[in-house]
Amino acid sequence: MPTSLKHLKISPKEAHTATVIFLHGLGDSGHGWLPVAKMLWSSFPNVKWILPHAPTIPVSLNHGMAMPSWFDIRHLDKLDNSENDDEQGMLETLKSVDELIQAEVDSGIPENRIVLGGFSQGGAISVLNMLTTKRKLAGVVALSTWVPLNHKIVQMMSEHAKDIPVFWGHGTNDPVVDYRFGQRSVDFLVQKCGYKLLSQGTTFARPGIRFESYPGMPHSSCPQEIEDLKSWLMEALK
Protein backbone atom coordinates (compact mmCIF):
# COMPACT_ATOMS: atom_id res chain seq x y z
CA MET A 1 0.00 0.00 0.00
CA PRO A 2 1.24 3.58 -0.63
CA THR A 3 2.40 5.59 2.39
CA SER A 4 1.89 9.31 2.96
CA LEU A 5 5.11 9.84 4.93
CA LYS A 6 8.25 10.54 2.94
CA HIS A 7 11.14 8.54 4.31
CA LEU A 8 14.70 7.34 3.91
CA LYS A 9 15.28 3.64 3.45
CA ILE A 10 18.39 1.53 4.00
CA SER A 11 17.97 -1.86 2.40
CA PRO A 12 19.38 -4.96 4.14
CA LYS A 13 22.58 -6.44 2.73
CA GLU A 14 21.10 -9.94 2.88
CA ALA A 15 17.57 -11.40 2.72
CA HIS A 16 15.02 -9.01 4.25
CA THR A 17 13.46 -10.61 7.34
CA ALA A 18 12.91 -7.67 9.74
CA THR A 19 12.36 -3.89 9.73
CA VAL A 20 13.21 -1.04 12.10
CA ILE A 21 11.19 2.18 11.74
CA PHE A 22 12.67 5.14 13.67
CA LEU A 23 11.07 8.57 14.11
CA HIS A 24 13.20 11.69 14.62
CA GLY A 25 12.60 14.52 17.07
CA LEU A 26 11.11 18.01 16.70
CA GLY A 27 12.67 20.11 13.94
CA ASP A 28 14.74 17.26 12.57
CA SER A 29 14.35 14.85 9.65
CA GLY A 30 15.13 11.24 8.93
CA HIS A 31 18.60 12.39 7.87
CA GLY A 32 19.37 13.25 11.50
CA TRP A 33 19.36 9.57 12.50
CA LEU A 34 20.87 8.22 9.29
CA PRO A 35 24.41 8.00 10.80
CA VAL A 36 23.09 5.87 13.69
CA ALA A 37 21.17 3.60 11.33
CA LYS A 38 24.27 3.18 9.17
CA MET A 39 26.31 2.43 12.29
CA LEU A 40 23.93 -0.38 13.25
CA TRP A 41 23.30 -1.61 9.71
CA SER A 42 26.32 -3.91 9.50
CA SER A 43 25.29 -5.73 12.70
CA PHE A 44 21.83 -6.51 11.31
CA PRO A 45 22.29 -7.89 7.77
CA ASN A 46 18.62 -8.87 7.38
CA VAL A 47 17.08 -5.60 8.63
CA LYS A 48 15.61 -2.80 6.54
CA TRP A 49 15.82 0.64 8.21
CA ILE A 50 13.07 3.20 7.57
CA LEU A 51 13.59 6.81 8.70
CA PRO A 52 10.45 8.89 8.08
CA HIS A 53 10.36 12.68 7.74
CA ALA A 54 7.77 14.57 9.80
CA PRO A 55 5.50 16.99 7.93
CA THR A 56 6.13 20.71 8.34
CA ILE A 57 3.42 22.28 10.52
CA PRO A 58 3.00 25.39 12.72
CA VAL A 59 4.36 24.68 16.21
CA SER A 60 3.15 26.65 19.24
CA LEU A 61 6.47 26.15 21.04
CA ASN A 62 8.11 27.86 18.05
CA HIS A 63 5.74 30.88 18.24
CA GLY A 64 3.56 29.37 15.54
CA MET A 65 6.37 29.15 13.01
CA ALA A 66 6.31 26.07 10.80
CA MET A 67 8.88 23.32 11.31
CA PRO A 68 9.10 19.53 10.96
CA SER A 69 6.93 18.11 13.73
CA TRP A 70 4.89 14.99 14.38
CA PHE A 71 2.31 17.04 16.33
CA ASP A 72 1.96 20.48 17.90
CA ILE A 73 3.85 21.09 21.16
CA ARG A 74 2.81 23.94 23.43
CA HIS A 75 5.37 23.62 26.23
CA LEU A 76 8.21 21.42 27.46
CA ASP A 77 7.92 21.98 31.21
CA LYS A 78 4.57 20.21 31.62
CA LEU A 79 5.00 17.10 29.50
CA ASP A 80 3.37 14.89 32.12
CA ASN A 81 0.30 17.17 32.27
CA SER A 82 -1.18 15.80 29.07
CA GLU A 83 -4.62 17.41 28.99
CA ASN A 84 -3.23 20.08 26.64
CA ASP A 85 -1.64 17.51 24.30
CA ASP A 86 -2.37 17.79 20.59
CA GLU A 87 -4.39 14.59 20.54
CA GLN A 88 -5.72 15.09 17.02
CA GLY A 89 -2.23 15.65 15.62
CA MET A 90 -0.89 12.62 17.46
CA LEU A 91 -3.66 10.35 16.20
CA GLU A 92 -3.18 11.57 12.62
CA THR A 93 0.52 10.75 12.86
CA LEU A 94 -0.29 7.32 14.29
CA LYS A 95 -2.30 6.59 11.14
CA SER A 96 0.61 7.63 8.94
CA VAL A 97 3.06 5.50 10.91
CA ASP A 98 0.68 2.55 10.73
CA GLU A 99 0.70 2.91 6.93
CA LEU A 100 4.46 2.36 7.03
CA ILE A 101 4.02 -0.70 9.22
CA GLN A 102 1.26 -2.06 6.98
CA ALA A 103 3.46 -1.61 3.91
CA GLU A 104 6.09 -3.81 5.57
CA VAL A 105 3.46 -6.41 6.47
CA ASP A 106 2.19 -6.35 2.89
CA SER A 107 5.75 -7.00 1.69
CA GLY A 108 5.89 -10.17 3.78
CA ILE A 109 7.43 -9.00 7.08
CA PRO A 110 5.41 -10.24 10.10
CA GLU A 111 4.41 -7.71 12.76
CA ASN A 112 6.56 -9.53 15.29
CA ARG A 113 9.62 -8.79 13.12
CA ILE A 114 9.04 -5.03 13.13
CA VAL A 115 10.54 -2.64 15.71
CA LEU A 116 9.16 0.89 16.03
CA GLY A 117 11.20 3.55 17.77
CA GLY A 118 11.87 7.23 18.08
CA PHE A 119 13.71 10.06 19.76
CA SER A 120 11.98 12.77 21.85
CA GLN A 121 8.79 13.72 19.99
CA GLY A 122 9.24 10.71 17.72
CA GLY A 123 9.64 8.55 20.80
CA ALA A 124 6.35 9.85 22.18
CA ILE A 125 4.60 8.73 18.99
CA SER A 126 6.27 5.31 19.25
CA VAL A 127 5.10 4.94 22.86
CA LEU A 128 1.58 6.01 21.93
CA ASN A 129 1.56 3.48 19.11
CA MET A 130 2.77 0.75 21.46
CA LEU A 131 0.02 1.45 23.96
CA THR A 132 -2.85 1.64 21.48
CA THR A 133 -1.94 -0.58 18.53
CA LYS A 134 -3.53 -3.92 17.80
CA ARG A 135 -0.25 -5.01 16.25
CA LYS A 136 2.05 -7.32 18.20
CA LEU A 137 5.37 -5.67 17.36
CA ALA A 138 8.81 -7.10 18.06
CA GLY A 139 9.56 -4.14 20.30
CA VAL A 140 9.54 -0.38 20.82
CA VAL A 141 12.50 1.98 21.31
CA ALA A 142 11.88 5.16 23.33
CA LEU A 143 14.82 7.59 23.58
CA SER A 144 14.72 10.81 25.63
CA THR A 145 10.94 10.90 25.58
CA TRP A 146 7.72 10.67 27.60
CA VAL A 147 4.27 9.04 27.70
CA PRO A 148 1.76 11.31 25.90
CA LEU A 149 -1.97 11.50 26.65
CA ASN A 150 -1.32 10.03 30.08
CA HIS A 151 -4.61 11.42 31.41
CA LYS A 152 -6.55 8.95 29.23
CA ILE A 153 -4.06 6.48 27.78
CA VAL A 154 -4.96 3.67 30.20
CA GLN A 155 -8.48 3.65 28.74
CA MET A 156 -7.03 3.60 25.21
CA MET A 157 -4.67 0.66 25.79
CA SER A 158 -4.83 -2.48 23.71
CA GLU A 159 -5.04 -5.73 25.66
CA HIS A 160 -1.57 -6.90 24.58
CA ALA A 161 0.27 -3.56 24.86
CA LYS A 162 2.18 -4.52 28.00
CA ASP A 163 3.54 -7.62 26.24
CA ILE A 164 5.63 -5.54 23.81
CA PRO A 165 9.31 -5.30 24.89
CA VAL A 166 10.65 -1.76 25.40
CA PHE A 167 14.10 -0.16 25.36
CA TRP A 168 13.98 3.23 27.12
CA GLY A 169 17.08 5.44 27.29
CA HIS A 170 17.39 8.94 28.78
CA GLY A 171 20.25 11.29 29.65
CA THR A 172 20.42 12.72 33.17
CA ASN A 173 21.38 16.20 31.88
CA ASP A 174 18.62 16.53 29.30
CA PRO A 175 17.64 20.25 29.18
CA VAL A 176 14.77 19.71 26.72
CA VAL A 177 12.85 16.64 27.89
CA ASP A 178 13.88 16.64 31.54
CA TYR A 179 15.18 13.33 32.86
CA ARG A 180 12.45 13.28 35.51
CA PHE A 181 9.82 13.04 32.76
CA GLY A 182 11.52 9.90 31.51
CA GLN A 183 11.59 8.45 35.02
CA ARG A 184 7.95 9.34 35.65
CA SER A 185 6.94 7.88 32.31
CA VAL A 186 8.55 4.53 33.04
CA ASP A 187 6.98 4.55 36.51
CA PHE A 188 3.62 5.28 34.88
CA LEU A 189 3.98 2.34 32.49
CA VAL A 190 4.81 0.03 35.38
CA GLN A 191 2.28 1.28 37.93
CA LYS A 192 -0.68 2.21 35.70
CA CYS A 193 -0.23 0.10 32.56
CA GLY A 194 1.08 -3.17 33.96
CA TYR A 195 4.52 -3.20 32.38
CA LYS A 196 7.37 -5.15 33.96
CA LEU A 197 10.58 -3.21 34.73
CA LEU A 198 13.68 -5.29 34.13
CA SER A 199 16.29 -5.50 36.87
CA GLN A 200 19.55 -3.60 36.35
CA GLY A 201 21.92 -5.54 34.14
CA THR A 202 19.20 -7.47 32.30
CA THR A 203 19.64 -6.98 28.56
CA PHE A 204 16.24 -8.09 27.34
CA ALA A 205 13.04 -9.85 28.33
CA ARG A 206 9.71 -10.38 26.65
CA PRO A 207 7.72 -8.69 28.11
CA GLY A 208 9.70 -6.02 29.92
CA ILE A 209 11.03 -2.45 29.92
CA ARG A 210 14.78 -2.01 29.90
CA PHE A 211 15.35 1.48 31.33
CA GLU A 212 18.87 2.89 30.95
CA SER A 213 20.08 6.22 32.34
CA TYR A 214 23.13 7.96 30.85
CA PRO A 215 24.93 10.26 33.33
CA GLY A 216 25.74 13.66 31.86
CA MET A 217 24.06 13.00 28.51
CA PRO A 218 22.05 16.00 27.21
CA HIS A 219 19.14 15.83 24.73
CA SER A 220 20.95 13.54 22.33
CA SER A 221 22.38 10.05 22.16
CA CYS A 222 25.80 8.68 23.07
CA PRO A 223 28.00 5.69 22.11
CA GLN A 224 26.99 3.71 25.20
CA GLU A 225 23.30 4.17 24.46
CA ILE A 226 23.81 2.96 20.90
CA GLU A 227 25.70 -0.10 22.17
CA ASP A 228 22.93 -0.83 24.67
CA LEU A 229 20.33 -0.40 21.95
CA LYS A 230 22.24 -2.77 19.69
CA SER A 231 22.33 -5.49 22.35
CA TRP A 232 18.59 -5.06 22.92
CA LEU A 233 17.80 -5.17 19.20
CA MET A 234 19.85 -8.34 18.83
CA GLU A 235 17.47 -10.03 21.26
CA ALA A 236 14.28 -8.40 20.00
CA LEU A 237 14.99 -9.52 16.43
CA LYS A 238 16.61 -12.85 17.25
UniProtKB/Swiss-Prot annotation:
Q: Name a biological process GO annotation.
A: fatty acid metabolic process
Q: Which domain of life is it from?
A: Eukaryota
Catalytic residues of the enzyme: S120 (charge relay system), D174 (charge relay system), H219 (charge relay system)
Look up the EC number in the record and give it: 3.1.2.-, 3.1.2.22
The enzyme class is hydrolase
Q: Which UniProt keywords apply?
A: Cytoplasm, Fatty acid metabolism, Hydrolase, Lipid metabolism, Nucleus, Serine esterase
> Does this UniProt record's set of keywords contain 4Fe-4S?
no
- Tell me, what's a Pfam family for it? Abhydrolase_2
The entry lists its GO molecular-function terms as: carboxylic ester hydrolase activity; palmitoyl-(protein) hydrolase activity
Q: Where in the cell is it found?
A: Cytoplasm; Nucleus
Swiss-Prot/TrEMBL catalytic activity: S-hexadecanoyl-L-cysteinyl-[protein] + H2O = L-cysteinyl-[protein] + hexadecanoate + H(+)
Cellular component, GO annotation: cytoplasm; nucleus
Q: What InterPro entries does the annotation carry?
A: AB_hydrolase_fold, LYPA1-2/EST-like, PLipase/COase/thioEstase
Similarity remark: Belongs to the AB hydrolase superfamily. AB hydrolase 2 family.
Q: What does this protein do?
A: Hydrolyzes fatty acids from S-acylated cysteine residues in proteins with a strong preference for palmitoylated G-alpha proteins over other acyl substrates. Mediates the deacylation of G-alpha proteins such as GPA1 in vivo, but has weak or no activity toward palmitoylated Ras proteins. Has weak lysophospholipase activity in vitro; however such activity may not exist in vivo.
Q: What is the protein named?
A: Acyl-protein thioesterase 1
Species for this entry = Cryptococcus neoformans var. neoformans serotype D (strain JEC21 / ATCC MYA-565)
Q: What is the lineage of its organism?
A: Eukaryota, Fungi, Dikarya, Basidiomycota, Agaricomycotina
